[in-house]
Amino acid sequence: MSHQIQYNDFPTFLRKYFPYKVQKISLNAGFTCPNRDGTKGWGGCTYCNNQTFNPDYCRTEKSVATQLEEGKCFFAHKYPEMKYLAYFQAYTNTYAELEGLKRKYEEALQVDGVVGLVIGTRPDCMPEDLLRYLEELNKHTFLMVEYGIESASDETLRRINRGHTYADTVEAVQRTAACGILTGGHIILGLPGETHDTMVAQAGMLSELPLSTLKIHQLQLIRGTRMAHEYEENPADFHLFKEVDEYIDLVIDYVEHLHPDLVLERFVSQSPKELLIAPDWGVKNYEFVTRLQKRMKERGAYQGKKYRDSEKRVIFAEDNFTTE
């Protein structure tokens, strides 16, 4: 990556695969999670409320095809020639019997204008028979599997009730990428118990994995979640980046320690105002990106600037990660 480019952005990445504008359409295909249904735990992740990212057209009583058609109507007025990626986003989209999964994925691909799939899932929910199916599907359509990593610390993963370990992440990402499938990750910055240094060290750890893309966003406290209750009882356990500029500087430090080839899809997330407790910056996503780019220019920062330094500093322990 040229140092004239501050970071690898997702739209540029997509242009390598498509000669036209492409938009993801989020889907709720009616799945659950193993840490919700009792297989690995109850109640789900302590921070999770799926209402925060499900558009109005995402309703489980609607078929996958119906949700896609309604999503197309939502976007088509701006770009009539746009094509779409079916984004299986809500909950764990590989957590079902293989034949049922195949029906849903293939239903999505039959919708006019859909040119590929993005499948969001957990690192502990990629059985071998499904991976073999996806490997074959990948030969015929655009496909990305996006893993919810959230943290590289097992201690944090236990605290937020994820029900998997970082070793599960390493194995799943390596297995998926080895099949030639584009493999993405998602992490949250600001989870309770994590410091600036441990979060930045995490960037070096993720850079060791064969990830194609990475989504980053700030911890958001959402009404009705267990984490919101924990915050009410012990607010000192949380550092919520009340000022957006503090979070921007953390993101820059993080990005400087990432592998220079990794594609960065997102830096921030916006939850509905009626659900959000904190942080409430009042900054739209595009405004955040503008401020981030300005600050990176001021600091002379770019993705991977300190990547090799990260490799030397990261120590991975069984229950947590630290820096030298």
Region spans (language model):
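Acidic (Asp/Glu)-rich catalytic clusters
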Residues: 75-77, 104-112, 132-142, 174-178
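Short amphipathic alpha-helices and their capping/turn segments at secondary-structure boundaries
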Residues: 71-75, 126-140, 171, 200-210, ...
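N-terminal [4Fe-4S]-dependent radical SAM core
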Residues: 1-85, 324
